[in-house]
Amino acid sequence: MREVISIHVGQAGIQVGNACWELFCLEHGIQPDGQMPSDKTIGGGDDAFNTFFSETGAGKHVPRCVFLDLEPTVDDEVRTGTYRQLFHPEQLISGKEDAANNFARGHYTIGKEIVDLCLDRIRKLADQCTGLQGFLVFNSVGGGTGSGLGSLLLERLSVDYGKKSKLGFTVYPSPQVSTAVVEPYNSVLSTHSLLEHTDVAVMLDNEAVYDICRRNLDIERPTYTNLNRLIAQVISSLTASLRFDGALNVDVTEFQTNLVPYPRIHFMLSSYAPVISAEKAYHEQLSVAEITNSAFEPASMMAKCDPRHGKYMACCLMYRGDVVPKDVNAAVATIKTKRTIQFVDWCPTGFKCGINYQPPTVVPGGDLAKVMRAVCMISNSTAIAEVFSRIDHKFDLMYAKRAFVHWYVGEGMEEGEFSEAREDLAALEKDYEEVGIETAEGEGEEEGME
């Protein structure tokens, strides 16, 4: 089997995780107590969903995941929630005091005490796997736990499981909506290790997802539950081919191979279509061409950045439901003729497509309409550099005055780490700039380079 272990770190990671496992259970017909009436083989079995769930002798399906937080409240929601019987109590790890939005607490002082326990639990999960494929890590980089403990854990996973790929689903700070004053510090420090220790990072940001909920689902005041359910659909589409059988299946390492042209350039934009409320879906015919087009709309992007300001290097389209390869090819051909969607000149093909026959599932009573087909796009675009430059700018404003730095130094960090991380990100912005420069023809640009 090609198993995948999911690791949910900090409040954002756990809440997104909750939405994901709720959706995975619905997709596979697994009840909140872990029983799966449709599954006839007791024990292991070589079913496709075993990549994400392990089976006990009693026929109970247990998610291959751990939830980690430095304070108990968010973990307690899982312990008392609908799916409390689904998880093994040892999979929910929480500390006593939180990271207080401080990267240094999550990475050095408090995180250090809990990280070995986390790795033990992960080792137990890994030992149950016959062919571990890699890890999915869910966190946000604005807070203290997601950024600090998340980074620490990624660094340790690189040591313990060197060759295994790590995909990050990372919630980045939004341009307007902020949850903490020190977000820019935490994000820069955390991205520094995401650069080195993840193979692919999918960037999400709350504001972009809020806007999608407001605009497409007519939810006036979206809650985190609305946001997370939408994010869960994206993650479900990306992992559908690991959990179901389909025509063009895509495995975790295939993402890397097709999306990452250079090791550092691995921050992805994602979008999902159709995001549509039940009232509207009834009146619309959503063809493959239409959902493909809307996946490329700047407004569909799950991070606040405009792909029209950059060029695409590669792009993965994961279709699910009633889709045939012929329609996909036609839709992609149309996209290629559009002038607004530009690819870098050194990557002429640029598209990888996957098709999975399992139609999209929605949470009953949720906001999304049940549709016949959906597409999730994950793309590598030079425009993502906007997200970094925005955070870097905020970082610079605070760091010039050394504001709030004493909180980090007091937890055992050195001031040099700030400048080191900041330089790394400056280099990353430059990398993105260089990748987008025309190679052969642009004469004028060459002169500007010298």
Swiss-Prot record:
SUPFAM superfamilies: Tubulin C-terminal domain-like (SSF55307), Tubulin nucleotide-binding domain-like (SSF52490). Its EC number is 3.6.5.-. Mg(2+) binds at E71. PANTHER family: TUBULIN. The active site is at E254. Gene3D superfamilies: Helix hairpin bin (1.10.287.600), Tubulin/FtsZ, C-terminal domain (3.30.1330.20), Tubulin/FtsZ, GTPase domain (3.40.50.1440). It is found in: Cytoplasm, Cytoskeleton. Pfam families: Tubulin (PF00091), Tubulin_C (PF03953). One of its GO terms (biological process) is microtubule-based process. GTP binds at Q11, E71, S140, G144, T145, T179, N206, N228. Its cofactor is Mg(2+). InterPro entries: Alpha_tubulin (IPR002452), Tub_FtsZ_C (IPR008280), Tubulin (IPR000217), Tubulin/FtsZ-like_C (IPR037103), Tubulin/FtsZ_2-layer-sand-dom (IPR018316), Tubulin/FtsZ_GTPase_sf (IPR036525), Tubulin_C (IPR023123), Tubulin_CS (IPR017975). GO terms for molecular function: GTP binding; hydrolase activity; metal ion binding; structural constituent of cytoskeleton. This is Tubulin alpha chain. Dimer of alpha and beta chains. A typical microtubule is a hollow water-filled tube with an outer diameter of 25 nm and an inner diameter of 15 nM. Alpha-beta heterodimers associate head-to-tail to form protofilaments running lengthwise along the microtubule wall with the beta-tubulin subunit facing the microtubule plus end conferring a structural polarity. Microtubules usually have 13 protofilaments but different protofilament numbers can be found in some organisms and specialized cells. Acetylation of alpha chains at Lys-40 stabilizes microtubules and affects affinity and processivity of microtubule motors. This modification has a role in multiple cellular functions, ranging from cell motility, cell cycle progression or cell differentiation to intracellular trafficking and signaling. Keywords: Acetylation, Cytoplasm, Cytoskeleton, GTP-binding, Hydrolase, Magnesium, Metal-binding, Microtubule, Nucleotide-binding. Tubulin is the major constituent of microtubules, a cylinder consisting of laterally associated linear protofilaments composed of alpha- and beta-tubulin heterodimers. Microtubules grow by the addition of GTP-tubulin dimers to the microtubule end, where a stabilizing cap forms. Below the cap, tubulin dimers are in GDP-bound state, owing to GTPase activity of alpha-tubulin.
